[in-house]
Swiss-Prot record:
Native source species: Cellvibrio japonicus (strain Ueda107) (Pseudomonas fluorescens subsp. cellulosa)
Record-listed shikimate binding positions: S15, K16, S17, T62, N87, D103, Y217
GO cellular component labels: cytosol
Subunit and interaction comment: Homodimer.
InterPro entries documented for this protein: Aminoacid_DH-like_N_sf (IPR046346), NAD(P)-bd_dom_sf (IPR036291), SDH_C (IPR041121), Shikimate_DH (IPR011342), Shikimate_DH-bd_N (IPR013708), Shikimate_DH_fam (IPR022893), Shikm_DH/Glu-tRNA_Rdtase (IPR006151)
Protein name in UniProt: Shikimate dehydrogenase (NADP(+))
Native organism taxonomy: Bacteria, Pseudomonadati, Pseudomonadota, Gammaproteobacteria, Cellvibrionales
Gene from which this protein is expressed: aroE
Amino acid sequence: MTDLYAVFGNPINHSKSPSIHRMFAEQTGQDLHYTKQLVDVDKFAQTADAFFAQGGRGLNITVPFKQEAFRYAHSLTPRAERAGAVNFLVQLSDGSIRGDNTDGIGMVHDMHNLDWNIAGKRVLLLGAGGAVRGVLQPLLEEHPAQVVIANRTLSKAEELAKNFLDLGNVEAKGYDQLNGAHFDIVINGTSASLHGELPPLPDNLLNPGACCYDMMYGAEPTVFLQWAQQQGAAHTADGLGMLVGQAAEAFYLWRQIRPEVVPVLTALRRQLHEKK
């Protein structure tokens, strides 16, 4: 029997998850059916209950349900617990539901594919919302020399930094405190790119050979990546690889087989450019 999987979100029309998982399934010879489902904002739990009752094996979760999925799961992986959000649910053999968060590992794997080395580097994370919280543990497990979380509201960044201090050298700063600081990797975890905006960053922030990463993506370089190029970044990347990477981790956790990320990423990138 074909195993059923889905992604839940609202909105959901734009989701690339079904085509990503279809390509993974074809590549690995796995028999599965993956759909996208628009879920009423106040009906997450009952829709998830119905999905699993009808034989569904696993779910990906996107905006705005990641916190709700966190509460819905009967058990959580340590990284999901840290992230405070869940983008992955799986039904275990005893019928219980386990929640995980594959966003951070998706980003880290993408950086590995790009040959970016995180160990020993000074890393600047922009933003202190759910996207940043979701990537902090996997990022710190790569042993950077330092991670600075910069945010408009300093108290939010401070609270986040405090929660991860046991995993490495993490500190918080306001954007106005970044003058004179220099970083090897800058990661934009704000949604500013979606609105064509840029966090208020000073000039001369980048060390020679610096890498800049935007969790958002589009057919054209985001405003943040345009800034990075103007500032002399040696390497830039958007979040399309993170999207495929988190999906690959989910696929592996469901099917115990690791799909090839690069051909899927290449196909998606081509589709993006064709739509321009």
